[in-house]
Amino acid sequence: MEPLASRACPVCESPVVQGDLYCERCGHALGAPTCTSCGAAAVDQEGYCERCGARQPTGRDHAETVLDGGAAAVTDRGLRRARNEDAMALLATGDGVVTVVCDGVGSSPRADEASAAAVSTAGAALAAGLSSQEAFELAGKAVAALATSVHDAPACTYVSAVAGPGGITLSWAGDTRAYWLPGEDPGQGVLLTEDDVVPTGEITAWLGADSGEVSLHVRTLAPGAPGLLLVCSDGLWRYLDGYRFPQAGTPLDMAREMLRHALASGGQDNVTIVLIPLGATHG
């Protein structure tokens, strides 16, 4: 059979014939998914384009979660990243709420897998009643298990919150943050966490096979008045200088408004926002 002039391998551009499953020259699987960057039908099973090398977006480009009590979460790819490497969990547990937010370390491989593994593992552990330390250790093991070597070690930051009538327990490692937005003036947020970073901005604590010993920060607090707990990745907090948080609407409305602000400010990173109302009904 003669090659069809209109068909060529998207990787090596050699002619291929109708019905071929693989390119005879380079071995590329024909009919592969199309790359969102260069348009070639050349995406391999690992999610990379064999022509331009771009890693493809996941189904996490934009997602929202809302619980019956009003707590809400929004995560978005942003405007500059090829995929969303943030991950979040928001779970109802009796009269409380559990949230975990992890930001994949961009310099590590498969950072989106790291954040997803940490969030899934820690969220389930906290919802089952395990301590913050136990949940963190399990999440660390789940992320470390993704590594094929010390040079191929997916990594992510970590923050969790268990919130309920008795107060809030926060735990974190890295630079993903939590804020308290007081009910009388939610526009003025109070930072509750401390970043694990050096003066030039690089993080000094993370989850991953190459993280070494990581000391988990744990903080408990009992707000004396109604308000909202905000947990967010740096895709939001890097744009908070001079910003007043929304002062009205449901937590989902407020989270969407914060996302709009981050995107309007440049949207250079993935954005994840969780808002948990405490002490009163919002919206």
What is the meaning of each model-derived region?
Residues 1-283:
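PP2C/PPM-type serine/threonine phosphatase catalytic domain
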